[in-house]
């Protein structure tokens, strides 16, 4: 097998994401004509420690959200350096871009520019070798299909309603296969829609395809999801579990958590107890960003209280960054990391974060962003690293469904070699 193939062209363009904001798409062409194409996602609630997403700031165009600077960085600075390099050496490609940027947070070239190139190179390499992307990244051991973490009620920054917590999700950990898990979630989604309608609630959807009703409280969102699970013919806590993403950094003010929709302001200890009560009352298997990104003491309290029973995922806390993750591991906070490619900006650094997490006994959940495209890289990535969990929205809106459909194709390709771990994906908690 050939182990060297030159990059002959690197080209970027500005396209639109699912929130009608510009983003970067990159094409990488190889000497034999093979091409790899990748598009970059974007978040609404972003961690303060994420790599920099370069925006133009010209208010007269796309409200300042244009990405022509990032596109130009790809077409000039990055292309000049990468043309002639071996596309099969992903580490060297990413290292070259990191050195070209020269900042701690990708502020010069932009994480959106660098990630587009990094992923397009990986896709071009996979295409050249005639391999699926998950096989190219993960090798022969890539075989685990993920449990979906499916956002079906949106609140917080993802919706215009009075629900404080950002995401209420279902996880079909009791399903026998990925395709069955997807079917179960789809049926619950339909049941939830009819349940909300029958109770007089709006069934408009948020950024990630989940419903965004004006519920009376955060707990009511859980109650109505439980009702929908039962209505669809499944057992909560056996077939399907609940997962939450409060996105607590968004409601953290002056050292306290402001649940404005419920008229409550809680200390970190009280916030931890709030989750404890919910986890005792309902089949909650995972809580993401239960505490704010800089509330390390609050995270410690929460982890000590329920870290043995509930998956505690660090998103804004860790931002797919090995330095932040190493601190969390040392302090003993959280037990899982959310993986978002654009938080760190290259495929290599993303894989390093996943490896560090797994060595420490932390699970990894591969995730989309609220601003997505039709790009399906994360579907391949989650199988490549055998993470066992994926978070990519409701089974609605084509930019979300694209990832699920790609996973169906991968499941079909893996056939008997594929493995759906279900509850075993939560190997570091007692369930």
Curated annotation (Swiss-Prot):
Cytoplasm among keywords: yes
Superkingdom classification of source: Bacteria
Binding-site positions, Mg(2+): 245, 288, 315
KW Disulfide bond (keyword) present: no
Annotated catalytic residues: 208, 340
Gene Ontology CC: cell surface; extracellular region; phosphopyruvate hydratase complex
Known pathway: Carbohydrate degradation; glycolysis; pyruvate from D-glyceraldehyde 3-phosphate: step 4/5
Gene Ontology MF terms: magnesium ion binding; phosphopyruvate hydratase activity
GO annotation, biological process: glycolytic process
Catalytic activity: (2R)-2-phosphoglycerate = phosphoenolpyruvate + H2O
Cofactor annotation comment: Binds a second Mg(2+) ion via substrate during catalysis.
Coarse class of the protein's main subcellular location: cytoplasm
Residues noted as binding (2R)-2-phosphoglycerate in the record, renumbered to the chain: 166, 340, 369-370, 391
Subcellular compartments: Cytoplasm; Secreted; Cell surface
InterPro entries hit by this protein: Enolase, Enolase-like_C_sf, Enolase-like_N, Enolase_C, Enolase_CS, Enolase_N
Cofactor(s), names only, from the UniProt record: Mg(2+)
Enzyme Commission number(s): 4.2.1.11
PANTHER family in UniProt: ENOLASE
Family in the record: Belongs to the enolase family.
Classification via HAMAP family: Enolase
Role noted for this protein: Catalyzes the reversible conversion of 2-phosphoglycerate (2-PG) into phosphoenolpyruvate (PEP). It is essential for the degradation of carbohydrates via glycolysis.
The name this protein goes by in its record: Enolase
Source organism: Clostridium botulinum (strain Loch Maree / Type A3)
